[in-house]
């Protein structure tokens, strides 16, 4: 049965691994450099303008955001990596959170796909390649 895209909401903005949803709903995660368009893509896929917060300033997504699609699917917006006007400690915390999504997530079996977004203007960076091979 197809999910109803009109029944979409932000389930949680998780700043800690223990805040990840405990249910077994399938997940599709979006990964990429800061400001590559992960949040914009989620909004576009769902035909929504303001569901996923978008900014022209890199580093605005600082949590892992789980968007509930009709209680049948989560679209997961991961924090970007690379350039952001944030402290080293902030970047380290985001990196640990993203790492925890892949290594300490009790529902990792629910992850069906990771969409790695690459900036077409620059091509894959070393950070992008590191993420691809992660």
Language-model features: locations:
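Conserved G1/Walker A P-loop phosphate-binding module
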Residues: 1-89
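Conserved C-terminal guanine-recognition region of P-loop GTPase G domains, centered on the G4
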Residues: 92, 96-134
């Amino acid at each position: 049965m197809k999910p109803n895209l009109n029944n979409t909401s932000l389930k949680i903005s998780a700043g800690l691994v223990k805040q990840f949803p405990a249910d077994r709903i399938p997940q599709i995660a979006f990964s990429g450099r800061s400001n590559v368009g992960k949040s914009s893509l989620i909004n576009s896929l769902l035909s929504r303008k303001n569901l996923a917060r978008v900014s022209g300033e890199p580093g605005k997504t600082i949590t892992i955001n789980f968007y509930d699609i009709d209680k049948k699917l989560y679209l997961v917006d991961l924090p970007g990596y690379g350039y952001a006007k944030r402290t080293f400690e902030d970047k380290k915390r985001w990196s640990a959170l993203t790492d925890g999504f892949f290594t300490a997530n009790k529902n990792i079996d629910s992850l069906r796909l990771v969409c790695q977004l690459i900036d077409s203007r620059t091509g894959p960076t070393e950070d992008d390649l590191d993420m691809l091979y992660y």
